[in-house]
Regions:
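Acidic active-site catalytic centers that drive phospho-/nucleotidyl reactions
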Residues: 1, 17, 57, 104, ...
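Short linear motifs at protein or domain termini
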Residues: 1-66, 119, 180, 184-198
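Short, flexible segments with low predicted structural confidence
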Residues: 17-21, 31-32, 47, 82-83, ...
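Residue-level recognition of short, well-ordered coil/turn positions
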Residues: 27, 91, 142, 164-165
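A ubiquitous short alpha-helical element
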Residues: 42-47, 65-70, 91-95, 137-143, ...
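Conserved amphipathic alpha-helical segments that form helical-bundle/coiled-coil interaction surfaces
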Residues: 70-137, 149-159, 166-178, 182
Length: 198
């Protein structure tokens, strides 16, 4: 606390409040009389968040598909064009990853908004701090994974606009879990960043 307050030229109170919030979200570990540490990425929590996200996203996107209206297409096509444009640029891997994640979040938020379920997305965002860390870690240097996500987004929208419920269910499951399932190599290269499954 003291070092952080000094670095930002603020009193300890706002730093303490920020640390408490980060601790509640599982991002910091406070050990009294020892120090404050960035927590490990909790794979158990991420697995639970993915389960929650898949369950909710399947329901929200089914609702969106049932009420699909051609007028909704403009916003989604614009976001998909932005994603494609990012992938076509020769950006450094970290910059591309960060920009794509922002656009990815906007894509999913827009789907929830079009389905009239923005509050559901706000809830998911509120419980997804560990997942966001993990996702950022996975995507910062992996252009191929970003391309896979973009292609998934195209498939998701194609299924919605053609009212292909079965295809939508399949692509959403893969979209949510494939990155996590493919992360074993990264986890094995950086085991000190992760809490093991239990």
């Amino acid at each position: 606390e003291i070092d952080t307050a000094a670095a930002f030229h603020v009193s300890r109170t706002p730093v303490r409040d920020a640390f408490k919030m980060l601790e509640r979200e599982g991002l910091l570990e406070v050990r009294p009389h020892i120090g404050t540490f960035v927590s490990l990425i909790d794979l158990n929590m991420i697995s639970d968040i993915l389960y929650l996200r898949e369950t909710l996203e399947q329901a929200v996107l089914r609702d969106l598909t049932a009420g699909y209206d051609k007028s909704q297409e403009f916003r989604i096509r614009l976001l998909l064009q932005r994603q494609c444009g990012l992938l076509e640029q020769d950006l450094p891997a970290e910059e591309l990853g960060r920009a794509f994640i922002i656009n990815d979040n906007e894509f999913h938020t827009t789907l929830y908004e079009l389905a009239g379920k923005r509050t559901v997305m706000d809830f998911l965002t509120g419980v997804s701090s560990q997942y966001e860390r993990f996702r950022t870690f996975l995507n910062l240097g992996d252009r191929d994974n970003l391309l896979r996500l973009y292609n998934d987004h195209i498939k998701i929208w194609s299924c919605i606009s053609s009212r292909d419920y079965e295809g939508l269910s399949d692509v959403v499951s893969h979209h949510i879990y494939d990155g996590f399932n493919a992360s074993t190599e990264i986890i094995s290269r950086h085991p000190d960043y992760f809490c093991p499954f239990h």
